[in-house]
A protein has these predicted regions:
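Acidic/polar, compositionally biased interaction segments
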Residues: 1-160
Length: 160
């Protein structure tokens, strides 16, 4: 093997390893839990999550969560095709969904389980997503769903 072939092979392997580490949809979401009502107190846990959910709150707090807390899930998802994507939350209390920095779902305030949805056009490719949830006391619920052109998107396409 010539010296230039060795260099080219080494560079290719290095680029492949780097691409694997930078894959924005490989790791899912990063969940950060805060023991306060406005994401300002220090976080109590930050863990990767495949899907935003309140199911693991007891795990994050190693027991019952406080009466008031906030959670943010941040990461990326893959839009497999161009289209109008609809995001929906059902939350007890407030929730917000941002796609590529744009507010798509606003379900804020203190309330029982309420659904809110929003639609945004997306081109095929990877998009940033930030999901926020605020619990102000009482019942705890958060559910996220999304779809393209009126049809649900399979979980495997989301990788969030």
């Amino acid at each position: 093997m010539t010296r230039s072939a060795v260099i080219a092979t080494t560079l290719l392997v290095g680029l492949l390893l780097l691409a694997n580490r930078l894959d924005p949809v490989r790791e899912g979401l990063n969940a950060t839990y805060y023991a306060g009502p406005d994401w300002s107190l220090s976080s109590v846990a930050a863990t990767p999550r495949e899907y935003p959910s309140t199911e693991r709150l007891y795990e994050a707090w190693k027991g019952a969560p406080p009466e008031q807390f906030t959670v943010s899930w941040a990461g990326s998802f893959l839009a497999a095709r161009d289209g109008a994507y609809t995001f929906s939350t059902v939350s007890d209390d407030g929730s917000w969904v941002y796609v590529d920095g744009k507010l798509v779902v606003e379900n804020g305030g203190r309330h029982g389980p309420v659904e809110a949805r929003g639609t945004t056009p997306l081109v095929r490719g990877v998009h940033a997503i930030l999901i926020k949830y605020a619990q102000g006391g009482g019942g705890i619920q958060f559910d996220l769903s999304w779809g393209r052109d009126g049809r649900p998107v399979p979980d495997t396409a989301a990788r969030i």
